[in-house]
Amino acid sequence: MTDSTHRTTAIILAAGLGTRMKSRLPKALHRLGNQPMINHLITTARQVFDDVVVVTGPDMPELEKAVRPFKTVTQVERLGTAHAANTARDLFGTGDVAILYADNPLITAETMRRLLAARREGASLALLGMRPAEPGRYGRIVEDHGRVVKIVEFKDATEDERRITLCNAGVMCAGVDDFRTWLANVGNDNAQGEYYLTDVVEMAAKAGPVVCVEAPEAELAGVNSRSELARAEATLQTRLRNAAMDAGVTLVAPETVFFSTDTVIEADVTIEPNVFFGPGVKVRSGALIRAFSHLEGCEVGENAMIGPYARLRPGTLCAAQTHVGNFVELKNVELGEGAKANHLTYLGDASIGSGTNVGAGTITCNYDGVFKHRTTIGERVFVGSDSILVAPVTVGDDALIAAGSVITSDVPPGDLALGRARQTLKSGQGLQIKQSLKARKEQG
């Protein structure tokens, strides 16, 4: 970061339609780690640059909304990358300016800092390059004694140039005044009639040294198709898994655990295989997340045990020492310390006190077809198996709900509530019915 007279700016080009995505959604809004690609880049750029500006295309209100409160400018006609950058020239700031791409969401802050440092060490222009396993049709970076001479597109490259393994990633950084001048001089004398940023490189080379900062392919490879999006997701998940393990989290089978970028897991948490973390999850120290569980928008307290096959939905808070077992779903639930719901249960829009045990098959009926209603269960309550609590309803501390009950009225503290039909016995009729049914079956 710099003082107000030399503010650095990151210009993110995001006007591309992403036709290879085969989607109505702008390419920059496709998600990685449960947030739009462009938000990854903005978050990283804000760690390095003073200001961030996003260049959008026409008719992209969803994109403009997604990047608020950052400034946007619209490239009315899509006439190439240099044209897009030039659209934002009035927002370049007063110091160095970097051009980034919304479809390069995995560039790290460290790589951005290296780019900016290379520019400040005397380069007229610094750019990012990579050595992909399959260079394919990437533009090649032609160097002479460590200085970049030009970028040549694959289709225009000679056989010798095509053997160059250093490829252009498109990202570059220069001083604001020079950049404005170079952009103004980029022409469109090419088959597509577009203005390309790569043309800036030769201009910069005449003004001073142009240097290439190399970074791994996984950081710089573009996301232009669904398959490339999947590869980027795999790269991101590897980063998130490694970060979790480095922070003291045990992943029994790391490759099967999927995080969101905002997932917070404290040290000494153990996560079993095939667990998915949606947005907004916090897991406190000592918790155990068992296999095949799905968590989103929730918090899990210290030494809690979740799963296997549990689902925690938004608004759920499981306090310390709680147990949420197999095939239990919680939605907008406060589960008090030490409370348990271990089997085959749906609890929605409920508050459950500490020490309460919710038996197998219990359901809170929270929806009347129009409105949601809340169920409040006190501390140390025992809810018998196969109980139905029809909200709104309150069960007081130390109450006991008999198995199979339908509870429609409040239960005072310490009371026993039974809400089921009385059992009736009819001597011998069970055997008679079975024999009758068997006879009918034999008769066809």
Curated annotation (Swiss-Prot):
Residues 227-247 are annotated as: Linker. InterPro entries: Bifunctional_GlmU, GlmU-like, GlmU_C_LbH, Hexapep, Hexapep_transf_CS, MobA-like_NTP_Trfase, Nucleotide-diphossugar_trans, Trimer_LpxA-like_sf. Acetyl-CoA binds at residues 360, 366-367, 385, 403, 420. One of its GO terms (cellular component) is cytoplasm. Homotrimer. Catalyzes the last two sequential reactions in the de novo biosynthetic pathway for UDP-N-acetylglucosamine (UDP-GlcNAc). The C-terminal domain catalyzes the transfer of acetyl group from acetyl coenzyme A to glucosamine-1-phosphate (GlcN-1-P) to produce N-acetylglucosamine-1-phosphate (GlcNAc-1-P), which is converted into UDP-GlcNAc by the transfer of uridine 5-monophosphate (from uridine 5-triphosphate), a reaction catalyzed by the N-terminal domain. This is Bifunctional protein GlmU.
